[in-house]
């Protein structure tokens, strides 16, 4: 274990994952802690996250990401994390689902350099890192799932990623407060499939997940 990661961090991750109903293998637990160590190390120079205190990163980043894993459909094997930043939730998604192809996209070159380093050091062969504005990204095939965490408004999220999915794609938007005002401006060809209130161990404040579909 890296000297940047404490036994308390390891225990908090184990306990929090159990509370979320997420079963972590020893390898997944080790990789998540390895990711945490890289995040702590690189954040000092690269400003990857506004969370400066390493003791807050387990709950606010790792467990927050794990809180949506139960909504990742087992049959959807290609996922895009839009505006991934420091890699949430894309890196935990790639660690927990090695059989799925996960793409993390960000327009900030420093952040994609960090994500590339994470891919190399953690040997995440199922992870692809893309340095691009989302509007300019043109994948060969539509993604089965598109996810974002605090990326933008619901209107922008759906409009900017419309070309990256199709009517079979699920869009997952991770939010804090329920975005009722944003849903009013949702494009007419998108519909809310479900809304989930999430409880993240160690996190104060509201968390919500909205799952969207595009109409045929």
From Swiss-Prot:
E.C. no: 2.1.1.170
Binding site for S-adenosyl-L-methionine: 83, 88, 134-135, 149
GO molecular function: rRNA (guanine-N7-)-methyltransferase activity
Keyword ATP-binding: no
Catalytic activity as recorded in UniProt: guanosine(527) in 16S rRNA + S-adenosyl-L-methionine = N(7)-methylguanosine(527) in 16S rRNA + S-adenosyl-L-homocysteine
Protein's cellular compartments: Cytoplasm
GO cellular component labels: cytosol
UniProt keywords, alphabetically: Cytoplasm, Methyltransferase, rRNA processing, S-adenosyl-L-methionine, Transferase
Domain of life: Bacteria
Alphabetical list of CDD domains matching this protein: AdoMet_MTases (cd02440)
SUPFAM superfamilies in alphabetical order: S-adenosyl-L-methionine-dependent methyltransferases (SSF53335)
UniProt cross-references to InterPro entries, sorted A to Z: rRNA_ssu_MeTfrase_G, SAM-dependent_MTases_sf
Main location: cytoplasm
Its biological purpose: Specifically methylates the N7 position of guanine in position 527 of 16S rRNA.
Family: Belongs to the methyltransferase superfamily. RNA methyltransferase RsmG family.
Record-linked HAMAP family: 16SrRNA_methyltr_G
Protein's name according to its UniProt entry: Ribosomal RNA small subunit methyltransferase G
Organism: Pseudomonas putida (strain W619)
Source species taxonomy: Bacteria, Pseudomonadati, Pseudomonadota, Gammaproteobacteria, Pseudomonadales
């Amino acid at each position: 274990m890296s000297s940047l990661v404490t036994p308390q961090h390891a225990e908090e991750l184990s306990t929090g994952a159990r509370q979320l109903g997420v079963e972590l293998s020893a390898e997944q637990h080790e990789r998540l802690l390895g990711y945490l160590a890289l995040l702590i190390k690189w954040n000092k120079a690269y400003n990857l996250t506004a969370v400066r205190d390493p003791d807050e990163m387990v709950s606010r980043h790792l467990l927050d990401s794990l809180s949506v894993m139960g909504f990742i459909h087992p049959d959807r094997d290609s996922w895009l994390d839009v505006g991934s930043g420091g890699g949430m939730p894309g890196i935990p998604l790639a660690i927990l689902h090695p059989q799925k192809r996960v793409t993390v996209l960000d327009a900030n070159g420093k952040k994609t350099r960090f994500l590339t380093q994470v891919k190399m050091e953690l040997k995440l062969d199922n992870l692809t890192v893309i340095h691009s504005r989302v509007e300019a990204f043109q994948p060969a095939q539509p993604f089965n799932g598109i996810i974002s965490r605090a990326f933008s408004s619901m209107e922008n999220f759906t409009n900017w990623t419309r070309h990256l999915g199709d009517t079979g794609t699920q869009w997952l938007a991770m939010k804090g407060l329920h975005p009722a005002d944003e849903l009013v401006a949702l494009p007419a060809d998108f519909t809310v499939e479900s809304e989930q209130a999430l409880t993240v161990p160690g996190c104060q404040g509201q968390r919500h997940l909205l799952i969207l579909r595009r109409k045929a």
